[in-house]
Amino acid sequence: MNLNSIEIQKIIPHRYPFLLVDKIIDMEVGKRAVGIKNVTINEPFFQGHFPDQPIMPGVLIVEAMAQVAAVICMGSEENEGKLGVFTGIDNCKFRKQVVPGDALHIEIEMTAFRRGIGKAEGKAYVDGQLACSASLTFALIDKA
């Protein structure tokens, strides 16, 4: 299953400037997905991180991974309309800087999901090189 940015926005609540996944190029709902974030110099965070040497903040790489995980979970009917929130980030490692012009290739695999709590393993690559890896834990909650 492939999704463009319009279709992604029908599943998760994130919007510009905080929508950090541009498309899903492969997905098994509830199991795994591969997403792409095209990183451009026009990203608002590059104004201050860092003006003379723009680098995507690591926490936003992790957030991009979380958004792909949210698409996996909230793409199923039983989780439609829920809100995904972090409950934990473990074993997070940053291996490569992500800069304007990079295409962040995000691979997420769900490892557990019970009673609204999910766990996923995430990896983000640039040009085939590992940029970030992390274990993500989150809860799906009802919107207020």
From Swiss-Prot:
E.C. designation(s): 4.2.1.59
Show the InterPro entries listed in the entry: FabA_FabZ (IPR013114), FabZ (IPR010084), HotDog_dom_sf (IPR029069)
- List the active-site residues: 49
- Predominant place of localization: cytoplasm
The entry's cellular-component GO terms read:
cytoplasm; membrane
Question: Which UniProt key words apply to this protein?
Answer: Cytoplasm, Lipid A biosynthesis, Lipid biosynthesis, Lipid metabolism, Lyase
Q: Which reaction does it catalyse?
A: a (3R)-hydroxyacyl-[ACP] = a (2E)-enoyl-[ACP] + H2O
GO molecular function ontology, one term from the record:
(3R)-hydroxyacyl-[acyl-carrier-protein] dehydratase activity
Q: Name one GO biological process term.
A: lipid A biosynthetic process
| Keyword Nucleotide-binding set for record | no
Q: Write down the CDD domains for this protein, in alphabetical order.
A: FabZ
List the subcellular locations.
Answer: Cytoplasm
Q: Which Pfam families match?
A: FabA
Superkingdom of this protein's organism: Bacteria
> Which principal EC class is assigned to this enzyme?
lyase
Function, as annotated = Involved in unsaturated fatty acids biosynthesis. Catalyzes the dehydration of short chain beta-hydroxyacyl-ACPs and long chain saturated and unsaturated beta-hydroxyacyl-ACPs.
**Entries under HAMAP family matching the protein:** FabZ (MF_00406)
What family name appears in the similarity comment?
Belongs to the thioester dehydratase family. FabZ subfamily.
PANTHER family named in the record: 3-HYDROXYACYL-[ACYL-CARRIER-PROTEIN] DEHYDRATASE
Q: Per its record, how is this protein called by name? A: 3-hydroxyacyl-[acyl-carrier-protein] dehydratase FabZ
Species assigned in the record: Alkaliphilus oremlandii (strain OhILAs)
